[in-house]
Amino acid sequence: MTGKQIYLFVHYREADDRSGEQVHFAVSTDGRHWKSVNHGQPVFFAEKGERGVRDLSILRTQEGKYIILGTDLCMSENFVKKYNSKWPNIGRFGSRYISMWESEDLVHWSDQRLLDLGDGGFGCFWGPEALYREEEGDYLIYWASSNEVNNYGAKAIYGSTTKDFRVFSKPVLLYEKEEASIVDPFYFKDGENYYRLLKSRQNPFAVILERGKTLLGKYERLPEFDRWMSQYKANEYEAPIAYRLPDGKWCLLLDYFGKERDRTGYVPFVESDLYHGKFQEESEKFFFPYGMK
């Protein structure tokens, strides 16, 4: 690749109608100062399933194709009329599909596809992400779901593999936390170690960071990250993601969804020591055009 590096942030935003729960783009040259694409309006709309999309992620395949995945959910249209204004209903009676779009050039996009990964007793498919597994030569799609096996109680992390985003393996359980629901998984690698960000719904009611030697092997909690997170109110942050800045440091974004609506959206934290889970909030060094989620 020649020329300047450009960051692309695929996201949604909170709104009073379905225009927020669509595919939005923002770009940056330094990973800190973001500019909206299309004047802050959706780049394109979800027209299938619930006609909205949240928890978006993007992957560049080994062949250079771009894949966008997202949760098939439209809160603005369906929270009241479909789910009777009850969050547990979203986890139990939610969409059984993952929304997907494809592109060769980031400009021309395919029609929306609804990925059917099999029944499996799932009550929802939240926060889908995908990554390439070099040794296996395939892609792992992972997400959070409730399941009929525990009467749609605590959510856990499940995964499915594919080589072409057409044929998928039967979903399997990747991780569950005995005493709590786990949602918003995000895996990434730094050096020889894999890291896993998760939102725990109890003990603690916060984002947690874990480290492991292999992608799907055993992980250990990083207690220093727990101590760092404890300075913030319980259950104010969720949907963690991480990416490298030009200086090589990791930027951790946490979605603030507390009671102050004008503050909702991602808040940036930059690591001073990833190995020990140490981060520093740097909101004053970042710019977001609005509350990106």
Locate predicted features.
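Carbohydrate-active catalytic/glycan-binding domains of CAZyme proteins
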Residues: 1-293
